[in-house]
């Protein structure tokens, strides 16, 4: 993992990959579902850094559940194009972690998509939120301390709106 503030890349690099042919949709670009898959693979990689592995699950009978996410699509990605995904922790506590990920074109360096996720640490025996084990909480703290000194991303916490709606549901 390295800090990636150079060349307009924000956050700590987590994974690299390339857009697979089966990820392409009828519009000849990466389908929305596969952006989520790529971000999920990045989360799995980050979790390994923290020690949240299959072994952790088996030994402690605990894991993480994603409880909220928000994806933004900025620019298209086409078949075989390389990407890199970075992570920036926005907040964490004894039971939760809130992170923001960015997908960049690995060569052209443009921002292709963002993902904001909230995860809970869960005791699988009772399926309830539970505190992080001390060793994992320490790894999360170390990552947070060593991450880029990035501002809160403009997409973080963003709500969806239509500026001049022809129709709007009551209460919006």
What role is predicted for each listed range?
Residues 113-115, 131:
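A structural microfeature
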Residues 107-109, 125:
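Solvent-exposed strand-loop boundary residues in beta-sheet-rich modules
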Residues 2-66, 123-172:
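Hot-dog-fold acyl-thioester-processing enzymes
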Residues 46-91, 95-97, 112:
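Hydrophobic beta-strand-centered segment that forms part of the acyl-chain substrate-binding groove
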Residues 14, 110-112:
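Local beta-strand/beta-hairpin segments that build beta-sheet-rich folds
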Residues 20, 100, 118:
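Conserved beta-strand and immediately adjacent loop positions that scaffold enzyme active sites
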């Amino acid at each position: 993992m390295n800090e990636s503030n150079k060349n307009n890349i924000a956050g700590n690099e987590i994974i690299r990959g390339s857009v697979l042919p089966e990820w392409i949709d009828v519009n000849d670009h990466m389908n929305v579902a596969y952006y989520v898959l790529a971000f999920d693979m990045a989360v799995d990689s980050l979790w390994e850094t923290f020690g949240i592995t299959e072994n952790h699950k088996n030994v402690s009978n605990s894991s993480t559940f994603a409880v909220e996410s928000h994806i933004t699509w900025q620019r298209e990605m086409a078949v075989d194009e390389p990407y890199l995904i970075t992570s920036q922790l926005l907040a964490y506590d004894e039971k939760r972690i809130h992170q923001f990920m960015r997908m960049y074109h690995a060569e052209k360096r443009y921002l292709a998509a963002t993902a904001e996720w909230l995860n809970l640490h869960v005791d699988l025996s009772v399926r309830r939120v539970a505190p992080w084990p001390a060793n994992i909480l320490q790894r999360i703290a170390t990552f947070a301390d060593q991450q880029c000194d990035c501002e809160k991303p403009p997409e973080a916490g963003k709500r969806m709106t239509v500026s001049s709606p022809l129709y709007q549901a009551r209460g919006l």
